């Protein structure tokens, strides 16, 4: 077994290798003067079970091309099996046609990864579960809920916790955490007037005097979370913390979060944190290395990964 990584999330790749007690594979990813991407694998992979760790996060297209070219390089080097490990799967929000004459980009990206030569895909908290079906190769979609629940138990009195979904679409995910913590569930009902903006309307559930935990898969602009936090506090919540798997945090999101009423934003390292994220006083990053490392180990040894979903 060998593990390689592109440039998108080398810190996580190194942490995964530390968990597996393996060195990170030698690979060079560089650009020519015209910005074409060039990949060179620096060690023998013939007959090896190869795992390539690459989040297709910002800059999404560059990191996606790095992944595809790296898969091709490993395939042409006679690897026995190639697993694309995608802690964050970019384009996942384009999982359906929002109108006429529009693409389903998530399906296109799945096709590209398959055609490049990947034999398996391992990912984390896909934005929509049906994206698993976009791949024509075995795909394991791990859940971050166990990691988030463990952190909540270490930092909160569960008797005073209320799990909150920031919108109706995230109720299933929030319910899974609430069930694991044996806590009550509330929902923030919001209306989005235009793309990139969200207006909180009302809170469904009694949050007065509760430590509210907003749960979602992606935080992008941060507008939804900040508005939800304000609404919850107006309804009597003692504090509001957000637990989000993927910290996209584009544009002015970090500044928006740091100046908001959120007590804390807890994200995973599925996307490598920027300097701004690392220096923010109310943003904390927790590791997925053990979860992904264990899944990689079991996959390589042909063992079941189903217990990792519990």
Swiss-Prot record:
Pathway listed for it is: Metabolic intermediate biosynthesis; 5-phospho-alpha-D-ribose 1-diphosphate biosynthesis; 5-phospho-alpha-D-ribose 1-diphosphate from D-ribose 5-phosphate (route I): step 1/1
Q: What residues sit in the active site?
A: 190
Show the Pfam families listed in the entry.
Pribosyltran, Pribosyltran_N
Q: Which domain of life is it from?
A: Bacteria
| Keywords for the protein's UniProt record, in alphabetical order | ATP-binding, Cytoplasm, Kinase, Magnesium, Metal-binding, Nucleotide biosynthesis, Nucleotide-binding, Transferase
Q: Which GO terms describe its molecular function?
A: ATP binding; kinase activity; magnesium ion binding; ribose phosphate diphosphokinase activity
Task: Tell me which residues bind D-ribose 5-phosphate.
Answer: 192, 216, 220-224
Sequence positions that bind ATP:
34-36, 93-94
Requisite cofactors: Mg(2+)
Q: What positions does the entry give for Mg(2+) 2 binding?
A: 167
Keyword Transport in the entry? The reply is no
What this chain does, per the entry, is described as: Involved in the biosynthesis of the central metabolite phospho-alpha-D-ribosyl-1-pyrophosphate (PRPP) via the transfer of pyrophosphoryl group from ATP to 1-hydroxyl of ribose-5-phosphate (Rib-5-P).
* Subunit relationships: Homohexamer.
Q: Know the name of this protein?
A: Ribose-phosphate pyrophosphokinase
Q: Which organism is it from?
A: Rhizobium meliloti (strain 1021) (Ensifer meliloti)
Q: What is the lineage of its organism?
A: Bacteria, Pseudomonadati, Pseudomonadota, Alphaproteobacteria, Hyphomicrobiales
């Amino acid at each position: 077994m060998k593990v390689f990584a592109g440039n998108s999330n080398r810190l996580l790749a190194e942490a995964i290798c530390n968990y597996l007690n393996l060195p990170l594979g030698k690979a060079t990813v560089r650009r020519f003067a015209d910005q074409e991407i060039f990949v060179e694998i620096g060690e023998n992979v013939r007959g090896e079970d190869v795992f390539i760790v690459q989040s297709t996060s910002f800059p999404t297209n560059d990191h996606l091309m790095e992944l595809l070219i790296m898969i091709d390089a490993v395939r042409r080097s006679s690897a026995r099996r190639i697993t694309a490990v995608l802690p964050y799967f970019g384009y996942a929000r384009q999982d359906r046609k929002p109108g006429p004459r529009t693409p389903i980009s998530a399906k296109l990206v799945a096709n590209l990864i398959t055609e490049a030569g990947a034999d398996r895909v391992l990912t984390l908290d896909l934005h929509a579960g049906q994206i698993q079906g976009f791949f024509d190769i075995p795909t394991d979609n791990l859940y971050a809920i166990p990691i988030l629940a463990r952190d909540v138990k270490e930092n909160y009195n569960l008797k005073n916790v209320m799990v909150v979904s920031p919108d109706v679409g995230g109720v299933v995910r929030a319910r899974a955490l609430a069930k694991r913590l044996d806590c009550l569930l509330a929902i923030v009902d919001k209306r989005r007037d235009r793309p990139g903006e969200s207006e909180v309307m009302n809170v469904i559930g009694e949050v007065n005097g509760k430590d509210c935990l907003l749960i979602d898969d992606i935080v992008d602009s941060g507008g939804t979370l900040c508005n939800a936090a304000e609404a919850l506090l107006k309804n009597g919540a003692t504090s509001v913390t957000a637990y989000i798997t993927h910290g996209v945090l584009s544009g002015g999101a970090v500044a928006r979060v740091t100046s908001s009423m959120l007590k804390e934003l807890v994200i995973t390292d599925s996307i490598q944190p920027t300097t701004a994220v690392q220096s923010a006083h109310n943003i904390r990053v927790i590791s997925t290395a053990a979860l992904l490392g264990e899944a990689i180990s079991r996959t390589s040894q042909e063992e079941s990964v189903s217990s990792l979903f519990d």
